[in-house]
Amino acid sequence: MQLKRPSMVTLGKMSHVGIVVRDMDKAVEYYGSVFGLGPFTTEVYDLKSFAYRGKTASARVKAAIAYSGPVFIELVQVLEGETVHTEFLRERGEGLQHVAFLVRNLDEKLKELAKSGVEPVMRLRIPIDNPADQAGTAKKTRLELTEVYLDSDKIGGTMIQLMEFKEVPVTCPE
């Protein structure tokens, strides 16, 4: 399928580059000792119920980040489950898997991209903060990050990731 002539979608600032790795400890050591990157902050994410290639999926992912100026390097190791990262690792090996940009009005951007034949292959939401602030007062909203990975087979294989931070209402269990 040939790409349709796109109507240009304006992205925000570049956030980071994502590099898929097989062994996080070796990768952190390598990027730190060879290139002087770091310190790396590492977290494990339990990703539950996200959209992946038209299905609902779950995965466990370890990510390590280190800033280089205003942009960060993200190392990604999938511990369990199938994601765009495991797909990349299986088909291409370790390496640069995505370039991420911050956007506003993500859903509008996705509609515009769809007109150009560019579709999301993975979409997930990650809660960022606790509904209670430091004083223990309940909040009515919380910050949420939505990440969308766009199909890149037609444009060389490096995915574009769109990221939107949004305040969302907190729902309390009844």
Question: What is each PLM-predicted segment?
Answer:
Residues 25-46, 90-94, 102-127, 172:
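Extended intrinsically disordered, low-complexity coil regions enriched in Ser, Thr, Gly, Ala
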Residues 2-7, 14-22, 64-71, 88-105, 107-174:
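Vicinal oxygen chelate
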Residues 70-78:
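Ordered, amphipathic secondary-structure segments that act as subunit-interaction surfaces
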